[in-house]
Amino acid sequence: MSCDEGKLFVGGLNFETTEESLEQVFSKYGQVAEVVVVKDRESKRSRGFGFVTFENPEDAKDAMMAMNGKSVDGRQIRVDQAGKSSNDRRGGYRGGSSGGRGFFRGGRGRGGGGDRGYGGSSRFENRSGGYQSSGSRDYYGRSHGSYGDRSGGSYRDSYDSYTTQE
C-alpha cells in the first residue's frame, strides 16, 4: 500500500503539459518515482489529468498541499491523493450509480447503512421521508401549496356545499 500512499492524482492539466514538465514541477518536493499523463488511446493527446508517484509518501503530502490550486502551464490544477480521491470525493459513487439522485442525497449521511438498505426499507424511508417532508413542502412549497389551497380548497368548498344542500 505504500505505493498508493505516495501517488497523487493531478487534474485540470493543460493539454500541452508533458510528463517531463510535470516531473520538473513536482520534483521540488521530493524524489519522484513515476509520472504519467493519461492520454487518449487514438489521438494520443493528453486527457487533462495524470498521476505523480513519490518515493516518500510524506513528500507526496507536501506536494499535494503546496500544488493544489496552483497554475501549471497556464491552467489551475487540482491535486489529490490518488487512492483516496475516488473514495472520498465520490463518497456515494457506488450508491449514486445504482441508487439515483434521491437516494444519493438521503444515503450520504448513512454510509454503509444506506447502501445495505438500498433495496429494502431504508430506500422507501428515504423516498417518503426525504421527498415528502422536504420535497413537497420546501421545493414545491409555493406553487404546490397555493395551487392546492386555491383550486383544491374552492373545489372542495363548493363540492361540500352541494352535498349539504341536497
Swiss-Prot record:
Membrane-spanning intervals of the chain: none
Biased composition (Gly residues): 93-120
Keywords: Cytoplasm, Developmental protein, Methylation, Nucleus, RNA-binding, Stress response
Main function: Cold-inducible mRNA binding protein. Acts cooperatively with elavl1/elrA to stabilize AU-rich element (ARE)-containing mRNAs by binding to themm and inhibiting their deadenylation. Essential for embryonic gastrulation and neural development, acting to maintain the expression of a set of adhesion molecules, and cell movement during embryogenesis. Required for pronephros development.
Organism whose genome encodes this protein: Xenopus tropicalis
Gene3D superfamilies, sorted: 3.30.70.330
Predominant location: nucleus
InterPro entries: Nucleotide-bd_a/b_plait_sf (IPR012677), RBD_domain_sf (IPR035979), RBM (IPR050441), RBM3/CIRBP_RRM (IPR034278), RRM_dom (IPR000504), RRM_dom_euk (IPR003954)
Protein name: Cold-inducible RNA-binding protein
GO molecular function, one term: mRNA binding
Compartments where found: Nucleus, Nucleoplasm; Cytoplasm
GO CC terms: cytoplasm; nucleoplasm; nucleus
Entry text on domains: The glycine-rich domain, which contains a number of RGG motifs, is necessary to regulate nucleocytoplasmic localization.
